Amino acid sequence: MADNNKKPAGLTEKKANRRGAARLAAVQALYQMDIAGAGINDIFAEFESHWLGNEVEGDTYLPAEAAFFRDVVSGVVRDQKKLDPLIDEALSKGWPLKRIEAILRAVLRAGAYELQHRKDVPGRVVVSEYVDVANAFVDREETGMVNAVLDQIGRQFRGDEFGRG
């Protein structure tokens, strides 16, 4: 039986899983900040002490790379005014970012941040990981939108990896 689990080149399984868990946690944290207006320090304290690597309401959350989680969340918060216009430009006409569900805004912002700033992670891995994160929350059509938007942003910031178009 073939192993269909795709791992990013150069990352150990443990590191890849910890980064994937960090991405999922970052999206959840950004969503909570967007919906509830929670502050970044409160979010860090809550997620690092109660969520990452713990059991919550019967679900066990994977241990996450805390530094990666913090970088994505703080980077999105710091750069949101620059990220949102990039995402708006990549979205279909008539669908500005403010009309997109809050969870998808969090996914797109985190993915756009990583594509722009985390050159240590291959761009295609970033897109694939955030499509997987989106898949945990929304249907296939919306994950297709996540793929298309992040691919377009990837071409802008990492044309050498994606091809310029």
UniProtKB/Swiss-Prot annotation:
Source organism of this protein record: Bradyrhizobium diazoefficiens (strain JCM 10833 / BCRC 13528 / IAM 13628 / NBRC 14792 / USDA 110)
One Pfam family here: NusB
GO cellular component: cytosol
Family: Belongs to the NusB family.
Name of the protein in its database record: Transcription antitermination protein NusB
Transmembrane segments: none
GO MF terms, alphabetically ordered: RNA binding
InterPro entries documented for this protein: NusB-like_sf, NusB_fam, NusB_RsmB_TIM44
Stored SUPFAM superfamilies: NusB-like
Single GO BP term: transcription antitermination
Stored HAMAP family: NusB
Gene: nusB
Keywords: RNA-binding, Transcription, Transcription antitermination, Transcription regulation
Protein's job: Involved in transcription antitermination. Required for transcription of ribosomal RNA (rRNA) genes. Binds specifically to the boxA antiterminator sequence of the ribosomal RNA (rrn) operons.
